[in-house]
Design a protein with these regions (language model features):
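Long amphipathic alpha-helical segments used for membrane anchoring, targeting, substrate engagement
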Residues: 1-31, 83-111
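Residues at secondary-structure transition points
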Residues: 2-5, 61-72
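Residue-level signature of catalytic and energy-coupling elements of molecular machines
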Residues: 11, 47, 74
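N-terminal hydrophobic or amphipathic segments with adjacent small-residue motifs
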Residues: 30-31, 39, 71, 75, ...
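N-terminal intrinsically disordered, cationic/polar leader segments
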Residues: 33-50
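Short, acidic/hydrophobic/Gly-rich beta-strand patch recurrent on exposed beta strands
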Residues: 53
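A short acidic/small-residue loop/turn micro-motif
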Residues: 56-59
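Short, well-ordered alpha-helical segments
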Residues: 66-86
């Protein structure tokens, strides 16, 4: 190991950094807007939906087809938000582990 570093100390530091990253992801958010501003979804780094905003100016509740479209847009917005949140979390973990989480058997030790 470089500089005679203690592997256990390095592992403990990595675990501590990962715990801190997990904690910060709880308060970090990502935002997705779909349908030309019809729907906005905000989700945390832990994939918890924080808010869903529906813009009443673009919605025609008397149009049955629009209601179906609105449901489809909502599903798309939530799914895109989850994907962005997962990517944000993966980036954070990759920065800490440097890819070590991909080593079989080691991932469980890191978090």
């Amino acid at each position: 190991l470089p500089g005679g570093a203690n592997p256990m100390a390095m592992l403990q530091k990595m675990q501590q950094d990962m715990a801190e990253a997990q904690e910060s992801l709880e308060s970090e958010t990502t935002e997705v807007t779909v349908g030309g501003g019809a729907i906005k979804v905000v989700i945390t780094g832990h994939q918890r939906v924080q808010s869903v905003e529906i813009n009443p100016e673009v919605i025609d509740l008397d149009d049955e087809e629009w209601l179906t479209d609105l449901q489809d847009l909502l599903v798309a917005a939530v799914n895109q938000s989850i994907e962005q949140s997962q990517a944000m979390a993966a980036e954070r973990m990759e920065a800490i582990t440097g890819g070590l989480g991909d080593i079989p058997g080691l991932g469980g030790l890191l978090g």
